[in-house]
């Protein structure tokens, strides 16, 4: 947290930096902030999952992630209302410091305390995901479930301006707005995913039907007839709502593994998914260079991402109401 918040505040001071290239400085600071942020969601989800009764885990983790992902929306509005992008970094850094102060008073879960007291038990061992075939396959499936979220955010929203001409829209798309609307949908979807999971009494069914909902949105975004950029932003909300199972996906990852490596799973799985955006982007641009069609490129990448996610969702073990008091 300290690393992330200091890097954010430093980003707000960049206009006053004259001793080095501002782009290099910004890239370096965002990398540092990313390191500080990388494990926060997974650690928070793990703490909530281990602290709440199993009947309330889905609701609790969804609320945590739902409010957390609203940060991207608040940041965009902060810039628009203040007219100065540096203000968003100052506010974000200050809020992070406040969160750090609140975090000091949060107690560890009883399950974790029992494991941490056992000096003979291996804890937080990342290599352990690769020492067992069953555990490794389970780890890969957890990663695959999250791929559609970053396909929608990293390609359809972040690269929205790439699709303006091919979709014959009446105006240019703004990637910043596309991301903002997508995150509004994701935040709402995160809240809903917990409710849907409780209603269906299944993590797998909740994620599966949200994936189906997202696929419909992707097809409408890329193939339906419309000319207004506003409709593209509407579909960004749709895709965000569908891929709002992000909290549920991290929760499933946490629930799959024992207490001694649960936090490691919950922090590394979402980061592995984010990292998979690199090969997805590479494939996207490679197909464009071959076919010149951005829509076809998006469809190919999307088919791969959604196929892997659906297969993994259907074949991974159900964790609804699972007792988390176990070790690997």
Regions found by a protein language model. Name each.
Residues 7, 22-38, 230-244:
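Hydrophobic core of transmembrane alpha-helices in multi-pass small-molecule transporters
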Residues 190-202:
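Helix-to-loop junctions at the C-terminal end of transmembrane segments
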